[in-house]
Regions:
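Extracellular glycan-recognition regions
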Residues: 1-180
Length: 180
């Protein structure tokens, strides 16, 4: 990840521990706004680059998810009230492919995996006012659509990789093949 920082990428909520392509989340980190739980959190970790207009963001990652809601994947962040995160989230002991679209309040959708994935590839394609999220498992291409969502067009966003531990003490994720 050092090479990304040298090419203009930056941290939003930099974690205490990261090296190479590996990030260990800090405790009590998350991105969420209001829905169901009633709280607002803007403390998760993002390593991203500022992008305006259309783009495609793809990353492959693997994490040692341990505790409820441990999560890793991609993020597209306009501001604290407008963002998307998608990846794996550990829910009730199982890995879920997850997408949260937030426009003032968070809207969460999941697909339960029958078996834990060794790795996940997530692709977010921003075209005009739309972000399409697709995924692939265990080395497969991101060919399965998870979510099609409205997102404000043309505005510059922070786009990159994300991880967080809302409840747990932290876990480690390795990000590979990051491209935008």
């Amino acid at each position: 990840m050092e090479h990304l920082i040298k090419s203009g990428w930056r941290w939003f909520n930099e974690p205490a521990q990261w090296t190479g392509n590996t990030v260990t989340t800090d405790h009590d980190t998350d991105f969420w706004r209001t829905t169901h739980y009633g709280y607002v959190r803007d403390t998760g970790h993002i390593l991203g680059v500022d992008k305006a207009g259309d783009f495609e963001l793809t990353v492959t990652f693997a994490g040692n998810y341990r505790e409820q809601y441990d999560q890793a994947g991609i993020a597209i962040r306009l501001d604290e009230k407008n963002w998307i995160k998608s990846g794996i989230e550990l829910v009730d002991g199982g890995q879920q492919i997850s997408a949260v679209v937030t426009r003032e309040v968070s809207d969460w959708s999941v697909v339960e995996l029958a078996e834990p994935a060794a790795s996940v590839t997530i692709k977010a394609e921003r075209t005009g006012d739309t972000v399409t999220i697709s995924y692939g498992l265990n080395g497969g291409p991101p060919a399965t659509m998870l979510r099609l969502a409205y997102f404000p067009p043309e505005l510059s966003v922070l786009a990159g990789v994300m991880c967080a531990s809302p409840i747990g003490k932290g876990f480690t994720t390795r990000f590979e093949n990051i491209s935008i």
